[in-house]
């Protein structure tokens, strides 16, 4: 260590200061001071306090919701945070510690309004930072649960969520502040969609008769998150089709037909894994369909068609002439 002269203001007492540059991040330093009077009397050496220079930026990351994800409700916000010390020894980490040292901000992407921990406030307002309780020291987890719900939650809206952290490095408490928000880490956009897709059956036609069916198909549409699949229930009144066989009527089951263009607003679907045996001739087959979107919203009310399974060939008989070898005038019709 080296003793250097410092600036002193006063007479028999006063204050001193010394400006230093070139600090090294994570390094521990000791500062000691001693005084000398005009008579050359010098204070005995006494070790001063040890401190650590922390210039690394803390980081808060969002683990829920993930970027570009879809939800049927507004999820509680969750994430991690660390003080950015990296490989520095524990004793040199300033830590985050306080619950007020992780914050989050929520903004609607349709009208720019910001969440104010209980209500939406008008734009311009972003970012409106809200404290998110943090558990840990130099690293840990944070949560924020007072998210929009009820009348404050609209379907078909995209939301931006930010997170930031502060450490406890002195003298500027609460210390170093995160000022970078990488997409997918500290800045995520997600959407809430509570409205289901809708599906319809275009084949087979309702109230028709068939001796077989090798494909059923239809359309599916969704207004926001996009279509996923059609949910089918195929039954005969005595059993349900599960994709591999018929189940007893007490076991209602469904099969799924993937949309031809997953994620689009409008598409088609088809299902070919149908039974080769539809049971006894005369059975009435019912096909119900419901639409499902990529957020897993499923249509509440199914649309249905019914068709009659008939594999019995018709029979015809000749009544006139009644026997082989007879002779008839052309004026006499042949009939049964």
Name each region found by the language model.
Residues 1-336:
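Low-complexity, disordered linker/stalk regions enriched in Pro/Thr/Ser/Gly
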């Amino acid at each position: 260590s080296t003793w250097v002269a410092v600036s002193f203001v006063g007479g028999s007492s006063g204050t001193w200061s010394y400006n230093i540059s070139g600090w090294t991040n994570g390094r521990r330093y000791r500062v000691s001071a001693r005084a000398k009077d005009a008579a050359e009397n010098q204070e005995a050496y006494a070790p001063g306090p040890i401190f650590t220079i922390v210039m690394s930026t803390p980081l808060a990351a969002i683990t829920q919701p993930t970027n570009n994800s879809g939800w049927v409700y507004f999820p509680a916000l969750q994430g991690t945070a660390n003080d950015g010390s990296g490989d520095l020894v524990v004793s040199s980490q300033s830590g985050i510690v306080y619950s007020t040292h992780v914050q989050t901000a929520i903004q609607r992407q349709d009208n720019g309004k910001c969440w104010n921990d209980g209500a939406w406030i008008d734009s311009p307002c972003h970012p409106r930072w809200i404290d998110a309780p943090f558990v840990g020291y130099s690293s840990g987890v944070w949560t924020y649960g007072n998210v929009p719900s009820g009348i404050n939650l609209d379907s078909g809206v995209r939301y931006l969520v930010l997170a930031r952290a502060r450490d406890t490095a002195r003298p500027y408490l609460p210390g170093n502040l995160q000022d970078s928000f990488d997409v997918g880490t500290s800045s995520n956009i997600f959407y809430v969609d509570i409205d289901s897709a809708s599906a319809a059956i275009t084949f087979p036609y309702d109230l028709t008769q068939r001796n077989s069916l090798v494909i059923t198909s239809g359309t599916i549409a969704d207004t926001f998150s996009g279509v996923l699949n059609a949910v089918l229930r195929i039954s005969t009144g005595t059993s349900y089709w599960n994709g591999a066989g018929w189940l007893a009527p007490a076991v209602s089951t469904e099969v799924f037909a993937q949309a031809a263009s997953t994620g689009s607003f409008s598409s088609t679907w088809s299902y070919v894994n149908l039974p080769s045996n539809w049971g006894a001739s005369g059975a009435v087959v019912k096909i119900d369909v419901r639409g499902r979107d990529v957020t897993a919203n499923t249509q509440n009310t199914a649309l249905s068609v019914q068709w009659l399974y008939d594999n019995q060939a018709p029979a015809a008989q000749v009544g006139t002439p009644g026997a082989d070898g007879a002779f008839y005038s052309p004026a006499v019709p042949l009939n049964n």
